[in-house]
Regions:
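Long, highly charged, low-complexity intrinsically disordered interaction regions
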Residues: 77-138
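Helix-hairpin-helix
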Residues: 62, 99, 132-155, 160-169
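Generic non-transmembrane alpha-helical segments
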Residues: 43, 47-51, 84-93, 150, ...
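Catalytic palm subdomain of template-directed nucleic-acid polymerases
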Residues: 66-86, 115, 155, 167
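Hydrophobic (often cysteine-bearing) scaffold residues that line and stabilize catalytic clefts
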Residues: 37-41, 57, 77-82, 143
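Active-site pocket-lining segments that scaffold enzyme catalytic pockets across diverse folds
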Residues: 62, 72, 96
Length: 169
């Protein structure tokens, strides 16, 4: 894991600690107990998320996509489900979490990222394109520093710039 303070130095959770220490030599690096994280993750998925739906795609110890379309009659709305998840995770485990709600995985992931460190953001279908286009390039999952630099060299500084480009450009 990388704290929000560490992320300001370009450190991310997938980065090797040796590289992170070069980027932030005065940082405090704590040992990671992955077995504990996996156990907590398993409990949260079993005790909280599975109570909503069985349609869960877990992508890491702390991230998943849920298709809640079959749960709406019982729960009322996606935002009610998201609020309940955040409440239960906080009450049961004293852990904060962010929830992104959208009609597809890409926009849901971007909404969750924008809701960090402890919020919820719902993007209605009619606003998907507008939301994505207002994002900086790095706001798109998969665009890291090197791809961003290449796009910048081509005059692309935002998702809106990217959307305006033709295939011939």
């Amino acid at each position: 894991a990388a704290s929000y303070e560490a992320r300001q130095y370009g450190i991310n959770s997938a980065m090797a600690s040796s590289r992170a220490q070069k980027l932030c030599p005065n940082g405090i690096f704590l040992p990671v107990d992955m077995s504990y994280y996996r156990a907590m993750s398993h409990r949260i998925f079993k005790e909280v998320l599975s109570r909503i739906t069985g349609r869960i795609e877990q992508v890491s110890v702390d991230e998943c996509y849920m298709d809640v379309s079959g749960a709406l009659l019982r729960w009322g709305s996606p935002s009610a489900i998201g609020a309940w998840i955040r409440e239960q995770v906080a009450l049961r485990y004293d852990i904060t979490c962010s929830v992104g709600i959208a009609a597809n995985k890409l926009v849901a992931k971007m909404a969750s990222t924008n809701a960090k460190p402890n919020g919820m953001l719902m993007i209605p279908v009619a606003r998907h394109a507008q939301f994505v286009q207002m994002m900086p390039l790095r706001g798109i999952p998969g665009i890291g520093p090197s791809l961003e630099k290449r796009l910048n060299a081509w005059g692309v500084d935002s998702v809106a710039d990217l959307a305006r480009m033709s295939l011939e450009s």
